[in-house]
Each structure stands twice: as C-alpha cells, then as structure tokens.
Amino acid sequence: MGLRKKSTKNPPVLSQEFILQNHADIVSCVGMFFLLGLVFEGTAEASIVFLTLQHSVAVPAAEEQATGSKSLYYYGVKDLATVFFYMLVAIIIHATIQEYVLDKINKRMQFTKAKQNKFNESGQFSVFYFFSCIWGTFILISENCLSDPTLIWKARPHSMMTFQMKFFYISQLAYWFHAFPELYFQKTKKQDIPRQLVYIGLHLFHITGAYLLYLNHLGLLLLVLHYFVELLSHMCGLFYFSDEKYQKGISLWAIVFILGRLVTLIVSVLTVGFHLAGSQNRNPDALTGNVNVLAAKIAVLSSSCTIQAYVTWNLITLWLQRWVEDSNIQASCMKKKRSRSSKKRTENGVGVETSNRVDCPPKRKEKSS
C-alpha cells in the first residue's frame, strides 16, 4: 500500500485528491445514514438489515443449559448488506490506524518511500492478523473445538452457525472486500496491483467457500493457522524495517512458514479426505448444506492443496531471487575491494617508482643563493 501525501493546500471539492485525503470522513458520513435510519420507523427495518446479522432461527436450548431458546444462523442474500456496512467500518478503522499510528511512526523513523509502503502494508496486516488470531482462538475454545476435535468436521445442527461464528465470517469478508477500494485510496502502484488482487482474491475465495459450504470450524482453524504464520511474517518485516540487524528473524520465519503450510495440509487431508469420506450419506445434497458429496470433497481438498503449493512456491522463488541478488551484491563488493586494493598498491609504489613512498626520505628543498 502506498503512502498518502498530505498537502497543506485544500484541493477542489469532489476532486480525486479531495477524495483520497478525506475518504474516511466520506465513508463515515455514508455509515451515519444507516445509523440514522434506526431513528425513523419507516427506515428502521431496512437499516437493521445492514447493521445486524440476518437469517436467524430460534432453537430450543440444551437441557444442561438455561431454559428457553437460542438463535442459530444460516447464510442468505441479506448477508451482502451486512458485509457492505462492515466493509465501511473496516475502511474507517484502516484510515484511523494509518493516520494515528503508522504515519507518526513513519515521521519518527524517517523511512525511505519504498520502506514506507512496505511498513504501512505490514503494519495494517499485523493489526488485522493479531486481532483475528485472538478472536478465532476464542471462538474455537468457546465452542469446544479444542476439547472435542470432531466438531471440526461435524457442525450441530449441520447447516447452522452460532452468532459469534457467523459474525466472524461476516467481518472477515468485509475486511477483504474493503481491500479493493483501499488499492485506490492508498495510491497503490500499478505494478503491485496484480499481486495485491491475487492475494485478496485467494482469501475471499477460501473464506467464502468455507462459509457457503458450512465448513465453519475447519475454515476457522485453518484461518487461525494461516493468520498466525502471516502475523509472524509481517512482524519480522516491521522489525527489519526498523533495524536491518533483525534479518535473521526472516530466516526463522521461513521455517515457521513451511511448518504452518504442512500443518494446514495435514488438517485439510485428515478432515476432508478421511472423516467426511468415512461418513458418506446415501442421499447427499450440497444445496442444503451437506457438503459430503464427491464433487465438494474434491473441490475443497484440491483447493487447499493448490493454495498451499502456490504460496510455498512463491516463498521458494522469493528466496531464490534474494539469494541471486545477494550473490550479485557480494560479487560486486569483492570487485570493489580488489579495485581499491590495487589502487592502494599503486599509490604505495608497488610496481611503480615514486618519491611519495613511505620508506623514501623526503626531498630537501635547495636554498637559493
């Protein structure tokens, strides 16, 4: 993500520079319209669709819990409105972190323009990954997925989600959708846009797939693992930008990165390949949320394997490029050292007769008569 330059001059209203400088305020005004809609009876029902989770069903509470009923959720068309509103919230939070945290650090550290772009990108992702890891781990613990791992492939009831599970997925979709307008707001370079689009698209594809196929617990576990590895990656980048002596941390991150991909593959294969295949139903129907069909299993497993192979290949190519660049830099440094040593030898009189050598006595000036 690029760094916005704030000029002291006020740009014309509705100009491109005006929108870039004040996009957070503009988005806040749009969000306020939905909040003000709650005040009036005629628009309250429409505003609630954007602000709260939709498609809920009341089910009886368990016997060991308190009497009454609890609400479970499924997905539907109205979720698009909720995702849109929280996408606006993500844009506002993004601008707040950029202005009040990252921009102040940039001024203190006095980074170059290239480092500013990398620092801003790593800073934004670090905050998001850190918050998502804590939130996702809390959901896994509260829904007993760690104490009962079978819940990873068994949702009860099959096509329903709890409030916190659905809100987590809505928030994730909103964040990654907000990354598209941020490419414009942050003045991303044209050569970086394809890489960013692939990165955003892969996250949206897998999060949406887990959400629509009701693989909520499996998707949540894989997201936590993935976000943890990415968090270490961007944290190492932040330390490296602040001081290049932390370059060894990047090598440590590469090991954790490979291990994280292996764990993700193992969990995916065990869950999708064995457990879903072992509980084959006679009349599966993916439209009702039952993903225990051959096409869905092959799609989920192949998608997980493909993305892990793609990301790992990118890491290998990146390290090969760095290795080639480092070797070229070392070769150029050796040439410079050799040229400097040869110059010193010539200056010291090695192979050349000169009176400026150290071991030669200085010439005495002849007195004029």
Swiss-Prot record:
It is a multi-pass membrane protein. The keyword Transmembrane helix applies. The chain crosses the membrane at residues 30-50, 82-102, 122-142, 165-185, 197-215, 220-242, 250-270, 298-318. Residues 51-81, 143-164, 216-219, 271-297 are lumenal. It is found in: Endoplasmic reticulum membrane. Keywords: Endoplasmic reticulum, Membrane, Protein transport, Translocation, Transmembrane, Transmembrane helix, Transport. One of its GO terms (biological process) is SRP-dependent cotranslational protein targeting to membrane, translocation. Residues 335-369 are annotated as: Disordered. Belongs to the TRAM family. This is Translocating chain-associated membrane protein 1-like 1.
